Design a protein with these regions (language model features):
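Catalytic histidine-centered segment of alpha/beta-hydrolase-like enzymes
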Residues: 242-251, 255
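Flexible "cap/lid" loop of the alpha/beta hydrolase fold
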Residues: 95, 104-136
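Short beta-strand/loop motif that positions the catalytic acidic residue
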Residues: 204, 210-212
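Active-site loop/oxyanion-hole signature of alpha/beta-hydrolase fold enzymes
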Residues: 43-85, 256
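Conserved alpha/beta-hydrolase catalytic His-Asp/Glu region
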Residues: 106, 115-117, 139-203
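Acidic catalytic loop of the alpha/beta-hydrolase fold
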Residues: 191, 214-219
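Conserved alpha/beta-hydrolase "nucleophile elbow" surrounding the catalytic nucleophile
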Residues: 19-21, 78, 82-84, 213
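Conserved HGGG/HGGXW glycine-rich cap/lid loop of the alpha/beta-hydrolase fold
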Residues: 6-51
């Protein structure tokens, strides 16, 4: 029986990748390597992280930073790809300036129902700073101890895609003294601003692809389901067995989904943005 290959867009897409919390631009390396060579990809550190000199801030200000990054790279319109917290940034940007966003791809994105008691505790005016500092000091230490035990038990080094959450936290505090403040600022924004991002979802005009693992332990799968219902033009795909960190644990699946999604959305050969 003949099979039909998914449509592939031949347009020169510009894609801006937004990492999660904590995270960095390097989280996207495995994904961008697998994308068509003629696509223009930008993966930069968000405010408060890595090489970005801007202080940590909320969703709206992060969105303005996205537009600044686009301007710096000569990109007029782009496809925004956001993971976790970065998904909230992508939604904020798409609702603020629909004319600059051609499509949105959300990987295990924050959204309705994702804020829990721990999030609210970390964002509280009195206890928040102390809890954030203690958590930032203790969690990496615990993670490194766990990673050492796992390495010993397996009698080999861990691969990049193994125990990703432990690996991310195990390296989170090394050489980045300001990160606990970034963590605190973003927790406060998550609690204070997420409802505003959700309220503006109806303003998102671009087509949206949502990717998530039903067994995600960090952002409930129900959050992705609610986003799919709220967004005017959304398509949901499951990525089973990858957990929360899809860019690292399932880069091939993510890249293939991106290519297929943009192929369906843009079948003409006219140039895109930029």
């Amino acid at each position: 029986m003949a099979t039909t290959e998914p449509p592939v867009s031949t347009r020169t897409h510009a894609l801006v990748f937004l990492h999660g919390q904590p995270g960095s631009s390097t989280d996207w390396q495995q994904v961008t390597r697998l994308l068509p060579a003629h696509w223009h990809t930008v993966a930069a550190d968000r405010p408060g992280y890595g090489s970005n000199p801007r202080p940590a801030t909320g969703f709206a200000a992060n969105a303005h930073d996205v537009f600044a990054q686009m301007d710096a790279h000569g990109i007029q319109r782009a496809v925004l790809v956001g993971h976790s917290y970065g998904g909230g940034v992508a939604l904020a940007a798409a609702s603020m300036a629909p004319h600059r966003v051609e499509a949105v791809v959300l990987l295990a994105s924050v959204g309705p129902g994702c804020v829990n008691v721990w999030d609210r505790l970390l964002a509280a005016p009195g206890t928040g700073p102390l809890c954030a500092l203690v958590a930032w000091r203790l969690t990496p230490w615990i993670a490194r101890a766990r990673l050492a035990w796992l390495t010993w038990r397996q009698a080999r080094p861990l691969a990049p895609g193994e125990h990703v959450n432990w690996q991310i936290w195990g390296h989170a505090s090394r050489g980045h003294g300001r990160l606990w403040r970034t963590f605190l600022a973003e927790q406060r924004a998550l609690v204070a601003e997420l409802s505003q991002v959700q309220a503006a979802i109806a303003l998102v005009q671009a087509p949206v692809l949502l990717l998530a693992d039903p067994d995600d332990r960090l952002v409930p799968f129900g959050t992705t389901g609610e986003l799919a219902k709220m967004l005017p033009d959304a398509h949901l795909e499951l990525v089973e067995g990858a957990g929360h960190h899809l860019p690292i644990r399932a880069p091939g699946v993510v890249a293939d989904a991106l290519v297929a999604f943009l192929g369906r959305c843009f079948r003409q050969d006219a140039p895109l943005g930029g």
